[in-house]
Amino acid sequence: MNVLLIFLGCGAGGVARYGVSNLMYLLMGKQFPIGTLIVNITGSLLMGILFIFILERLSGNIQLWRSLLLIGFLGGYTTFSSFSIETFNLIEAGHYFGAALNVLLSVALCIAGAWLGVLIGRQL
């Protein structure tokens, strides 16, 4: 059952990532990997909220919710591999400031998003 839930969650998360990324690129252009950055920040925020909510607020078989939402949906939604290749492409194109900014913003804002998510999750 867990494998099926992870499969379904990953599919939904991947579709959500595709939609959010494309919307951000449509609105803001592709000069900077803003789509991946927004996806990873919102994914980190949701991870914090759902982690606390599932562990502290739900009763019953929390492993099913963890499989569907944390491992599945958020695993399919967020992407370290896209962050990595987009940063590499910035470096290869000589956009060193953009590459450094992408690394700094991704790390700092994703950690901040997870922290904020935990705080929000504890208030639910």
UniProtKB/Swiss-Prot annotation:
InterPro entries: FluC (IPR003691). Na(+) binds at G75, T78. Belongs to the fluoride channel Fluc/FEX (TC 1.A.43) family. Keywords: Cell inner membrane, Cell membrane, Ion channel, Ion transport, Membrane, Metal-binding, Sodium, Transmembrane, Transmembrane helix, Transport. This is Fluoride-specific ion channel FluC. It is found in: Cell inner membrane. GO terms for cellular component: plasma membrane. The gene is fluC. One of its GO terms (biological process) is cellular detoxification of fluoride. NCBIfam families: crcB. Fluoride-specific ion channel. Important for reducing fluoride concentration in the cell, thus reducing its toxicity. It is a multi-pass membrane protein. It catalyses: fluoride(in) = fluoride(out). The keyword Kinase does not apply.
